[in-house]
């Protein structure tokens, strides 16, 4: 059975991370009137919500595992460092750079055709990520053999 504490922690992590990303982006941009950014954050909210529902119904034990600590005892040390760097650069710093560029520099203004392409690729990536999580009940942030869950 899924531990409620870890389930709540998983949901909280997802949505607090999204809120932090939005705050970083809009603070760096210096403005809130950016329709494409709002579309992205709303779609990401919908993605987080629907993926949680799908995972909770199909692989509740995965929610329990992902709601716990990202750093398990058996996690590889090198992978812990990769996760820290990825979290900083991939989850937070990119929103600062994108917001700063859009609000102050506008170095690379992209047309609507790029928005459609980006949206399509974003949706494809969502489907692939959720599919991988459903197919692999051992899907965790770091590399480790989960002996406690009989992974071989």
Could you say what each language-model-derived stretch is?
Residues 1-152:
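Membrane-anchoring alpha-helices and their flanking helix-loop junctions
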């Amino acid at each position: 059975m899924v531990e409620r504490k870890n389930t709540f922690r998983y949901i909280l992590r997802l949505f607090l991370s999204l809120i932090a990303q939005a705050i970083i982006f809009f603070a760096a941009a210096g403005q809130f009137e950016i329709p494409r950014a709002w579309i992205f954050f709303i779609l990401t909210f919908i993605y987080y919500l629907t993926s949680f529902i799908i995972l909770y119904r199909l692989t509740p034990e995965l929610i329990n595992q992902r709601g716990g600590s990202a750093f398990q005892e058996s996690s590889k040390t090198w992978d812990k460092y990769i996760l820290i760097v990825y979290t900083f650069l991939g989850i937070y710093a990119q929103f600062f750079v994108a917001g700063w560029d859009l609000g102050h520099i506008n170095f690379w203004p992209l047309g609507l055709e790029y928005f459609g392409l980006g949206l399509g690729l974003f949706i494809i990536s969502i489907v692939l990520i959720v599919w991988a999580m459903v197919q692999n009940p051992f899907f965790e942030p770091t590399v480790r053999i989960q002996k406690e869950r009989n992974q071989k």
